[in-house]
């Protein structure tokens, strides 16, 4: 199944992991590889090893806080081939939803592992153009 739409997001570096995890839901492990990145456009494969899901995503150029995005599910076999094609451009992380308020904003926190150990990012996904971001 494929879908296309508009992505609206902002990312923030997290200084206090304990505070972020205090308002976070259960985590899900994922592996993400970048097949191509040119400027602010990218093609990536994201895999959830625990349940075998995998999604290929193409993100277009930014316009303000928005950019076009298209996603399509792929089989685990295709995902494995695509991840291998990423070479060293692969990240391993645990993603958790943050239980914080905010009309029209969904928050997540990514805790990175491996060579990016110690990196923690919070991401605000805006569901509407007029959503106001108030970092927790």
Task: Give the predicted meaning of each segment.
Residues 1-136:
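Phosphate-end processing signature that detects enzymes handling 5′-triphosphorylated RNA
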């Amino acid at each position: 199944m494929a879908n296309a739409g508009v992505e609206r997001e902002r990312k923030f570096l997290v200084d206090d992991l304990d505070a972020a995890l205090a308002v976070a839901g259960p985590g899900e492990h994922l592996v993400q590889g970048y097949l191509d990145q040119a400027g602010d456009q990218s093609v990536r494969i994201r895999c959830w090893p625990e349940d075998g899901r995998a999604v290929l995503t193409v993100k277009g150029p930014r316009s303000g806080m928005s950019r076009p995005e298209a996603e399509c599910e792929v089989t685990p076999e295709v995902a494995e081939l695509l991840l291998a094609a990423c070479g060293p451009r692969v990240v391993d992380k645990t993603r958790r939803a943050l239980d914080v308020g905010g009309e029209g904003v969904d928050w997540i926190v990514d805790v990175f592992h491996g060579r990016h150990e110690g990196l923690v990012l919070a991401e605000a996904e805006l569901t509407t153009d007029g959503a106001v971001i108030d970092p927790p």
